Amino acid sequence: MNNSKVIKLQDRVPKLKNQKKKNKKNVNHRLILYISILFLLVLFLIYFRSPLSNIKKISVFGNHYMTDEQVMKDSGVTYDTSYFRVTAHKAEENLTKRKEIKAVNVKKRFPNNIDIHIEEYLTIGYINKEGKLQPLLENGKTLDVLPNGKLPVAAPIFEPFKEEKMKELIAELEKLTPAILKSISEIRYSPTNANEDHLTLYMNEGYEVSTTIQNFAKRMEAYPLILKTIEPGKKVLIDLEVGAYTKELGAEEKKE
């Protein structure tokens, strides 16, 4: 037998011992890793079920007709809600059931913050009902009368009139630019023998406008341009019913 091929037992023992130590070390490392993962899972479960995971801050943006508290209640998101139980899509669905809300975007910000961004339907006017104002939205729906009479959004006030004519006017108001819409203080339906669609407008700039429901939005496009031609301090009537011109009011008319 070739002596070079003979491996003595004494030479193998240290190698076997080292291998056992290495294996034992690997087992210990894996055991520590598993215990650490288990510990983290236990901590997460405790945090998930404890008040520590509850929402700490809810920020609401874009709401005019609902208080922040109403938004939170209707969304289903409150300070007693766990951050991990909040489903943004569900909260958005809950809020879009409100007739004044056009769109909602709910964002979660780890670890405990919720942002609710609301887009309301445009307020195109307020219907005066026995001295109480009822918001009228661009989707044709009305809200409950305002409890304190304060206008959350600048828009014209008008008396209720024929439903058919109201619908026509609403369709025209939707076409107005925000700047012109905010300039209108009050709209009065004032039909004449010659024009059953006649309207009288009282503007925030102090002027009176005579116009009509038909092509109302198109006629009102001339209003900002006419304003630039009026001398300060003059009391004039702006006629947009046929063409576009101004008429200075006389002494008797000023008295009225």
Swiss-Prot record:
One of its GO terms (cellular component) is cell division site. One of its GO terms (biological process) is FtsZ-dependent cytokinesis. Keywords: Cell cycle, Cell division, Cell membrane, Membrane, Transmembrane, Transmembrane helix. Residues 53-121 form the POTRA domain. It is found in: Cell membrane. The keyword Transmembrane helix applies. Residues 52-256 are extracellular. The keyword Membrane applies. The chain crosses the membrane at residues 31-51. It is a single-pass type II membrane protein. Residues 1-30 are cytoplasmic. Belongs to the FtsQ/DivIB family. DivIB subfamily. HAMAP family: DivIB (MF_00912). Cell division protein that may be involved in stabilizing or promoting the assembly of the division complex. This is Cell division protein DivIB. It comes from Bacillus cereus (strain ATCC 14579 / DSM 31 / CCUG 7414 / JCM 2152 / NBRC 15305 / NCIMB 9373 / NCTC 2599 / NRRL B-3711). The gene is divIB.
